[in-house]
Regions:
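Sec-dependent bacterial lipoprotein signal peptides
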Residues: 1-19
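Lipid interaction determinants
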Residues: 20-83, 89-142
Length: 142
């Protein structure tokens, strides 16, 4: 009886560990491929513009988990900055400047695999007219 209980406990621990290991992670470096902007008026999409990010002017986001807090590094073609922190809970990504926590960008994670990340910005408050941004990334492996 004791052996079967220990075996069952070991199997449960191994199953729990393997399910955690196999889940994709947002940590790492991502290159933005496309940006899509939808203009929305009274709940209706009135215009959609989707453009690739030029390879000669790349945009990177790098998600870093440091002991002092989660940092997002951003590269806009000229310089890396690490002025932002992030949280990721229940497929909701919130990005906040380190210096001003009263301003933030909130996105829903539409897709997260080992190689792809898609985010759509959640509009703040209710408005008759707003732009909804969607970003698509691929993981950079070096």
């Amino acid at each position: 009886m004791k052996k079967s209980f220990l075996f069952a406990a070991l199997v449960a621990i191994m199953c729990a560990f393997s399910s955690c290991v196999n889940e994709p992670t947002i940590l790492g470096k991502w290159q933005m491929n496309t940006m899509k902007m939808q203009s929305i008026v009274n709940g209706q999409v009135v215009q959609t513009v989707e453009e690739p990010v030029p390879s000669e002017d790349p945009i990177y986001w790098q998600f870093v988990d440091e002991s002092t807090g989660k940092i997002i590094e951003y590269f806009d073609g000229d310089v890396w900055t690490d002025e932002f922190t992030y949280t990721l809970n229940d497929n909701i990504l919130t990005i906040t400047p380190r210096e001003s926590s009263d301003i933030s960008i909130t996105c829903q994670v539409l897709n997260l695999t080992e190689t792809e990340l898609s985010l759509t910005q959640i509009p703040e408050g209710e408005s008759e007219y707003y732009h909804q941004m969607t970003y698509n990334f691929t993981r950079v492996t070096e």
